Amino acid sequence: MMNTKKLLKMAKKWQQRAALRRKRISFHRSTDTTSSSTAAEKGCFVVYTSDRIRFAFPISYLSNSVIQELLKISEEEFGIPTEGPITLPFDSVFLEYLIRLVQRRMDGDTEKALITSISSTRCSLPCSFQLQEHSSTRLVF
């Protein structure tokens, strides 16, 4: 398990890299979509799923081993993003299911089984996709 300082350092590095390129990222929005933002709220980090749904997590989730595994899988699949957001190779339904399991505070054996299951059943995506015209954000607390 990674220590908290290392996790915060990794998250800060990803946020800094995304911030360097944020001005170049163009999100196509319709005129009626004004509430979604490209920047994360204070104390949160943002990830996108393979179906281009935006999730905002509190920074405290970085200490959870399931979330750590999701970020490792994302890094293996897509690398550390330099010109875009962190994308997870899972759809939003699967991520919502994982979030519910994480919120239940699983015991160690269940958590290990879940991590093994995630690692063995992940899907592959083409690395070059663009965000759709609509984007929705889901806050997780």
Curated annotation (Swiss-Prot):
Its main location: membrane. The keyword Acetylation does not apply. It is a peripheral membrane protein. One of its GO terms (biological process) is auxin-activated signaling pathway. GO terms for cellular component: plasma membrane. Keywords: Auxin signaling pathway, Cell membrane, Developmental protein, Growth regulation, Membrane. Pfam families: Auxin_inducible. It is found in: Cell membrane. Belongs to the ARG7 family. May promote auxin-stimulated organ elongation, such as hypocotyls, stamen filaments and petals. This is Auxin-responsive protein SAUR61.
